[in-house]
């Protein structure tokens, strides 16, 4: 099938590679323009651009896909379908209408749950134990289009957003190939989403990473897992930011105030319910280290408090 692929992040790369392996003709790959990255702020290609070039595919990087030139570019390709995975721009109706089989999206949730930009992260933060991927035809709404196929999977109790994202990217790639085959054969019956069951997964903000020690330890642990790599789960230590990379909830009977250090070996911090064992932390401007090394190096004492002061 003659296709156009639209995508930008690493999550989209397995789908692009799977589509090519399946024998589809990818006539063009649209991805976001090169953006400044790193300390030197030098323009860097997106993961999808890098993958497309490695596959010898044509790459097109319009600033705005809704402008006349990109629309005419896409019209001239004459693709039967388009595939979109994390492209990063809203697709206007006049572009949606160009592909006879529609624009097919891989979304990292079991729609209609977790519509939006952060389904992987929010599913973990909210303590979900199962999630999955959905292929759908996009429409003018936010992840509201007709569903095509789904595949579910368990979320591991210690799995973080990066690990889950890598797994869902592979699941989504396989599901997308099956979706294209089903559309071509006419065996897929699109299913309307039940808006009454919809939940949202909004774009992450830096303040989402702030730890509220009054929450149960399990909820804080889920935030630590879910918000990696950005914005990350953060608290304060002696008035300075402290990033928590790994943790473990502990059932502990204690009367200490939330945020108080209960023990230093292992490093246990009181929460609204139970305690959180810190396993790996990072002070601002320093490397990630085991929490035991942090406690020793800072001469941490019991009853010191985390979370005091502003991030």
UniProtKB/Swiss-Prot annotation:
UniProt binding sites for (6S)-5,6,7,8-tetrahydrofolate: 109-112
GO molecular function per UniProt: methionyl-tRNA formyltransferase activity
GO CC field: cytosol
UniProt-listed InterPro entries: Fmt, Formyl_trans_C, Formyl_transf_N, Formyl_transf_N_sf, Formyl_transferase-like_C_sf, Met-tRNA-FMT_C, Met-tRNA-FMT_N
SUPFAM superfamilies in UniProt: FMT C-terminal domain-like, Formyltransferase
Superkingdom per UniProt: Bacteria
Catalytically driven reaction(s): L-methionyl-tRNA(fMet) + (6R)-10-formyltetrahydrofolate = N-formyl-L-methionyl-tRNA(fMet) + (6S)-5,6,7,8-tetrahydrofolate + H(+)
Record's keyword terms, sorted: Protein biosynthesis, Transferase
E.C. designation(s): 2.1.2.9
Described purpose of this protein according to its UniProt entry: Attaches a formyl group to the free amino group of methionyl-tRNA(fMet). The formyl group appears to play a dual role in the initiator identity of N-formylmethionyl-tRNA by promoting its recognition by IF2 and preventing the misappropriation of this tRNA by the elongation apparatus.
Family: Belongs to the Fmt family.
Protein name: Methionyl-tRNA formyltransferase
Record lineage: Bacteria, Pseudomonadati, Acidobacteriota, Terriglobia, Bryobacterales
Encoding gene, per UniProt annotation: fmt
